[in-house]
Design a protein with these regions (language model features):
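C-terminal catalytic core of tyrosine-transesterase DNA break-rejoin enzymes
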Residues: 119
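Vicinal oxygen chelate
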Residues: 1-11, 20-116, 126-137
Length: 137
């Protein structure tokens, strides 16, 4: 059986049980499944945003993965393509995300805005729009 290639980011958060609620409130994420460790921490939660899959792990003493908030920086940006950028952007901000760059239309054919979630992960909420006739790559 052929498998369609997909990209599934893995995000690490300080407190999985409560932090997953941010993704539900901000982006309408749903939980596909959630596995816990013996101490009650989250080993992995598989979440979906309108069918787009991602995983959340909780920081633990045994893990080498940490939330970007621990160092005040992130090495990646999660690009989330949606139909209504402004509505999703506003929803995420209302749920506790920090606005980094407001939603802007760019001449190269993107409407996008940048947010930082409460755990330090950077999100670009975006969609394609017509390229400006003045734009030259």
């Amino acid at each position: 059986m052929a498998i369609k290639t997909a990209f599934a980011p893995v995000l690490t958060v300080p407190n999985g049980i409560t932090d997953i609620d941010f993704y539900k409130n901000a982006f309408g994420a749903t939980t596909n499944f959630c596995l816990t460790n013996d101490d009650g921490s989250i080993h992995v939660a598989e979440l979906l945003i309108d069918g787009a899959l991602f995983h959340v792990h909780e920081e633990t003493q045994q893990s080498t993965m940490v939330s970007p908030a621990k160092y005040g920086a992130s090495t990646v940006t999660i690009g989330l393509f949606v139909d209504d950028v402004q509505a999703m952007f506003n929803r995420a901000a209302a749920a506790g995300a920090t606005v980094m760059t407001p939603v802007t239309d760019y001449e190269y054919g993107y409407r996008q805005g940048d947010l930082k979630d409460p755990f330090g992960h950077k999100w670009t909420i975006q969609c394609r729009i017509p390229v400006s006739s003045d734009w030259k790559p």
